[in-house]
Design a protein with these regions (language model features):
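Conserved beta-hairpin
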Residues: 44-63
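C-terminal "cap" of GNAT-fold acetyltransferases
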Residues: 80, 125-131, 139-141, 147-190
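Conserved GNAT acetyl-CoA-binding A-motif
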Residues: 107, 114-126
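Conserved acetyl-CoA-binding loop-helix of GNAT-fold acetyltransferases
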Residues: 93, 99-112, 136, 140
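Hydrophobic pocket/interface hotspot
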Residues: 4, 38
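Conserved acyl-donor/pantetheine-binding loop and adjacent beta-alpha core of acyl/acetyltransferases
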Residues: 61-98, 153-155
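Conserved beta-strand segments that form the floor/walls of ligand-binding pockets within enzyme
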Residues: 49, 61, 87, 92, ...
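Conserved GNAT-fold acetyl-CoA-binding loop/helix
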Residues: 9-37
């Protein structure tokens, strides 16, 4: 868990100093809540860590359960809930590995998992509302912005920019970047 939290802290610092955004400036919903969410996702096998030797290079969380706000209300609008989708969260690449296509490879890997393991036709992500650079990144990864719920209906939920992508052929050759290890399915970058 410390590796994931370390990657998130590193990303938060970079976002604050280099991108002038408040994304992850404070743990959401608070330190304890963030810690519990990360731990639960790890224990349930939803969070994956990409390792380069003993160094954590990136992390991604994939989940068939839709994200919820603080009142346990779904983030995605009702009209979209019937579509089979895999939800992607907490995609973080260490700055040391930035610009090498690792984020794109993780998203392509998630699309493959969505189709292969869950029969899903979409991968979805809810992106920090005010981080327009990140919105542009996801658009560059073949995601389309979708209309969400009325922001007044969501309780203190900072990621209200909703994006989805059809599960198609990957844009990257993620299989060359990852080598599966052990029966936990951890991935190492090569």
């Amino acid at each position: 868990m410390d590796e994931v939290r370390g990657l998130v802290r590193e990303a938060a610092e970079w976002l604050r100093t280099s991108k002038d955004t408040d994304q992850w400036a404070d743990p959401w919903p608070d330190r304890t809540g963030q810690r519990e969410r990360i731990l639960n996702d790890l224990l349930k096998g939803k969070t994956w860590i990409v390792w380069d030797g003993t160094t954590p290079a990136a992390t991604i969380t994939v989940d068939t359960d839709e994200p919820l706000d603080l009142n346990d209300q779904p983030v995605w609008p009702a009209r979209k809930r019937h579509e089979p989708a895999l939800y992607v969260r907490r995609v973080v690449v260490s700055r040391r590995y930035a610009g090498k296509g690792l984020g794109a490879a993780l998203l392509d890997w998630a699309a493959n998992v969505a189709k292969r393991d869950h029969g899903a036709t979409l991968i979805r992500v809810d992106v920090w509302t005010t981080n327009t650079d990140l919105h542009t990144y996801y658009k560059g990864q073949r995601f389309i912005r979708r209309k969400g719920r009325d922001p007044r209906d969501l309780t203190n939920y900072p990621s209200q920019a909703l994006f989805e992508r059809e599960v198609t052929q990957p844009g990257s050759d993620y299989k060359k970047l990852f080598v599966e290890e052990g029966d936990r399915g951890e991935r190492k970058s090569s």
